[in-house]
Swiss-Prot record:
<dbReference type="Pfam" id="PF02735">
    <property type="entry name" value="Ku"/>
</dbReference>
<keyword id="KW-0233">DNA recombination</keyword>
<keyword id="KW-0227">DNA damage</keyword>
<keyword id="KW-0234">DNA repair</keyword>
<dbReference type="InterPro" id="IPR006164">
    <property type="entry name" value="Ku70/Ku80_beta-barrel_dom"/>
</dbReference>
<comment type="similarity">
    <text>Belongs to the prokaryotic Ku family.</text>
</comment>
<dbReference type="InterPro" id="IPR016194">
    <property type="entry name" value="SPOC-like_C_dom_sf"/>
</dbReference>
<keyword id="KW-0238">DNA-binding</keyword>
<dbReference type="GO" id="GO:0006303">
    <property type="term" value="P:double-strand break repair via nonhomologous end joining"/>
</dbReference>
<dbReference type="InterPro" id="IPR009187">
    <property type="entry name" value="Prok_Ku"/>
</dbReference>
<feature type="domain" description="Ku">
    <location>
        <begin position="9"/>
        <end position="192"/>
    </location>
</feature>
<dbReference type="GO" id="GO:0003690">
    <property type="term" value="F:double-stranded DNA binding"/>
</dbReference>
<comment type="subunit">
    <text>Homodimer. Interacts with LigD.</text>
</comment>
<dbReference type="GO" id="GO:0006310">
    <property type="term" value="P:DNA recombination"/>
</dbReference>
<comment type="function">
    <text>With LigD forms a non-homologous end joining (NHEJ) DNA repair enzyme, which repairs dsDNA breaks with reduced fidelity. Binds linear dsDNA with 5'- and 3'- overhangs but not closed circular dsDNA nor ssDNA. Recruits and stimulates the ligase activity of LigD.</text>
</comment>
<protein>
    <recommendedName>
        <fullName>Non-homologous end joining protein Ku</fullName>
    </recommendedName>
</protein>
Length: 253
């Protein structure tokens, strides 16, 4: 596994050399865009809208728009001048109770492993967070952006969660019907609770597969071999909520 970031974790005067690795990977089926007339690959070129010429990556700079068609130009050298402690270090600003951080703030996850010479301090941090039921929060710069991150013990090591800043999270109060209270009967509530308890069991994520991807591969293989695609029938519609709950309970018995 290739490290995404290399630096150190600091808390107080303790400094721990570490490497950071992406915890997840995308396994989507990749498609190319083709010209329907002759099957040729569709290519995209970077063209200047002012002169109409195709430009190379070396000719491209970043610009911040201050008014229509007016920009402040920023070069790679400009970005390197920004004074950030978080470019080579994850500075833990504070520790907190994990229950205080809502799920909505989590973005992506990384594994942190100790680099050479950091094994003891790494284990000490992990063990201390476990025994105090604590998470750490701080910042790190990765791919040209300063990220808010949280650290917590996980499965024998430390995991880093990239977080959304508070101004990046939309308020659910903007949604119609959010928080609304509907009138339900006691029978409906009891049936719903029974259904939940009947469906409740220890979580085994390995039992869940990407069925859309599997169906897509079956479709591709069928088209290759010239076989007919069989479409399954839809689920029969149940008229009322109470009937749906009763039918669902019968199905899980």
């Amino acid at each position: 596994m290739r490290a995404t970031w290399k630096g150190s974790i600091s808390f107080g005067l303790v400094n721990i050399p570490v490497k950071v690795y992406k915890a997840t990977t995308q396994k989507e089926i990749q498609f190319h865009l083709l010209h329907s007339a002759d099957g040729g690959r569709i290519r995209y070129r970077k063209v200047c809208e002012k002169c109409g010429k195709e430009v190379s990556d070396g000719e491209i700079v970043k610009g911040y728009e201050i008014s229509k068609n007016e920009y402040v130009i920023l070069t790679d050298e400009d970005f390197e001048k920004i004074p950030l402690k978080s470019t080579k270090s994850i500075e833990i600003r504070q520790f907190f109770d994990p229950a205080e951080l809502g799920l909505i703030y989590y973005s992506s996850f990384y594994y942190i492993s100790p680099d050479k010479g950091g094994e003891k301090a790494y284990y000490l941090l992990k063990k201390a967070m476990e025994e105090t039921n604590s998470m750490g929060i701080g910042k790190m710069t990765m791919r040209g952006k300063e990220n808010l991150v949280a650290l917590r013990p996980y499965d024998g090591g430390i995991v880093l969660a990239q977080l959304h800043y508070i101004d990046e999270v939309r308020s659910p109060l903007e949604l119609p019907g959010w928080g609304a209270v509907a009138e339900i009967t006691e029978e409906e509530l009891e049936l719903a609770k029974k259904l939940i308890l009947a469906m409740k069991k220890p979580l085994k994520l390995e039992e869940f597969r990407d069925e859309y991807k599997e169906a897509l591969m079956q479709l591709i293989e069928a088209k290759l071999s010239g076989r007919e695609i069989v479409v399954s029938e839809g689920v029969e519609e149940v008229k009322s909520l109470i009937d749906a709950l009763k039918a669902s309970l019968e199905a899980v018995k």
